[in-house]
Amino acid sequence: VELKRPYPRTVKLGDGTAVRLRLMEPGDVHRVLAFARSLPADDLQFLRVDITRMLVVMLWAQNIKAGHTVTVLAEQDREVVGYASVHHDQVSWQRHLGELRVQVAPAFRSKGLGTVLGREIFAIAPEMGIEKIVAHMTPDQEQAIALVKRSGFQQEAVLHDFVIDRSGRKNGRVVMTCDVAALAGSAS
């Protein structure tokens, strides 16, 4: 996907911390894997896929190369400290939807990095033909739900016993959506 938005570039977070934003490339597999493996177990508990596995990150990189996924990495000192991805199935009946995934290192939380990364995705989404962003969480991810609500998402559904965590425990899935047109202008 050729994007108009300029990358790489440096942004300042709310506390003045500078991070470099750039697009993930297939050669970033080991950096992303190192980031994923540094996350606390609770952060990994309900991810749709296990990003601590090499094969999973390699498939992610293949989706980037094929144009199905765009991932914005946040780096400091060449280490990944967060990312936001939008996954887009261009041929299904949901081709107007993009799935948002955001992950931020604990040391960079409460600084606005998740919000910055989310805004990047909303700025990119129209260039991909995406009209609506979908986010999936579990009901106990209260901070994440509050963050996406503040960003303009609304809850569409709660699907009970819909996901199984890494330890085999079932939980619900909260489905939240936001129209891209409503937020794309504020992401510029």
Where are these regions (language model features)?
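Glycine-rich phosphate/pyrophosphate-binding loop shared by adenosine-nucleotide-utilizing enzymes
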Residues: T17-V19, D77-Y83, N171
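A short beta-loop-alpha structural element at the N-terminal edge
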Residues: V19-R31
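Acetyl-CoA-dependent GNAT
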Residues: V49-H96, R101-A105, G118, D179-A181
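Active-site acidic-Proline motif in GNAT/NAT acetyltransferases
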Residues: V102-A107, K111, P139-D140
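Conserved acetyl-CoA pyrophosphate-binding loop and the N-cap/start of the following alpha-helix
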Residues: F108, G112-E120
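Conserved GNAT acetyl-CoA-binding A-motif
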Residues: G118, A125-M137
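Conserved catalytic-core motifs of GNAT/GCN5-like acyltransferases
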Residues: V134-M137, I145, K149-N171
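C-terminal "cap" of GNAT-fold acetyltransferases
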Residues: D161-S188
